[in-house]
Amino acid sequence: MLVWLSRVNHCKGFGIQSPTDYSFVRYVINEHWPYYQYEEVGKDDDWLTRKLGLLYFRIANWLQPKVIMSDGYQDYLQEGCKTAMFNDQAETIDLVHLKLNGDYRSRVTNIYNKVNARSVMIIEDIRKDVSFWREVTNDEHTGITYDLFYCGIVMFDRSRHKMNYIINF
């Protein structure tokens, strides 16, 4: 509740001027209508795992990636895009889910070499290393970023103006 109250000014995309970014926040991040697999996928998970999993499901459904690199939540991601393949060794990765454990800094450097303007990276538990999240948002490889408190979403389309949105999720 305290997290929600501290971010109340960032509800439902208020203050976002870009129609594309607003649409992503409103209809992917904060979508409340049930999707076709909501009742089945992750029904036995705890509330936060399920909340994040359903977000990852919606992102995969929206992006329709060909290749996914993931540190977890494969069932949610696969339900979001049935045709996606999980392959950490692919030359190009469309969707990345990264947990901040192990040598995540060097992994991100490698990921930067495998993404394109259409790719999306989800970094889970960004509060674990706030300085790392700031580095990601300021990095020359990244474009639009979304801070959802529990995770961060990174877009790589650098043709657009760089922004970091704080979203009440």
Residue ranges and their predicted role:
Residues V120-I122:
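Structural detector of well-ordered beta-strand residues that form the stable sheet scaffold
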Residues M1-A117, I126-F169:
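A short alpha-helical cap/connector motif
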